[in-house]
């Protein structure tokens, strides 16, 4: 725990009443304060990898895509993505290896999930040796317009 000393000019009611009201120089009161660092936790999508995600495609729920990538899209555009086939090229930064990869985010009109497909297997599963049970996290970086990816728990 980090401790810091702050000085305040505020007095308790008793101190205020007992001091001379004509004296403009109020004493400063030191207070030792504990500062708890707030851990930055950016992960908007956290998934435990399944067999299907290791051999086929990485599923991303529509709600997560809507809340991240499509946060600033119009309601009409979001409504359209629910019933249409969508495919877009995206960048995914692997924060553990500091590499950037291209991927295709795809959505079938009958499914309610988006998916990273072919590039997911080559660029992440094989290269990073991902296995069933690993926990991965992703978040959308608005400044760089890309997903950021990391293995949060590599235990099997």
Curated annotation (Swiss-Prot):
Q: Subcellular location, in the record's words?
A: Nucleus
Top-level taxonomic group? Eukaryota
Major subcellular site: nucleus
Keyword field:
DNA-binding, Nucleus, Transcription, Transcription regulation
| GO cellular component term, pick one | nucleus
DNA-binding residues = 57-155
Q: Name one GO molecular function term.
A: DNA binding
- Keyword Transcription regulation annotated: yes
Q: Kindly provide the name given to this protein in its UniProt entry.
A: B3 domain-containing protein At5g26805
What does the organism's lineage look like at the top?
Answer: Eukaryota, Viridiplantae, Streptophyta, Embryophyta, Tracheophyta
């Amino acid at each position: 725990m980090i401790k810091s000393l702050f000085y305040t000019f505020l007095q308790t009611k008793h101190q205020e009443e007992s001091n001379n009201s004509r004296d403009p120089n109020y004493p400063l009161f030191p207070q030792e304060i504990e500062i708890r660092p707030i851990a930055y936790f950016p992960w908007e999508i956290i998934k435990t990898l399944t067999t299907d995600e290791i051999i086929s495609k990485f599923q991303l729920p529509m709600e997560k895509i809507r809340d991240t990538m499509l946060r600033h899209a119009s309601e009409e555009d979001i409504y359209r993505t629910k019933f249409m086939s969508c495919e877009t090229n995206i960048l995914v930064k692997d924060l553990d290896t500091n590499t950037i990869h291209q991927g295709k985010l795809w959505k079938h009109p009958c499914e309610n999930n988006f998916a990273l497909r072919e590039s997911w297997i080559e660029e992440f599963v094989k290269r990073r040796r991902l296995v069933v049970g690993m926990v991965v996290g992703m978040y959308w970086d608005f400044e760089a317009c890309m997903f950021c990816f990391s293995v949060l728990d590599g235990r099997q």
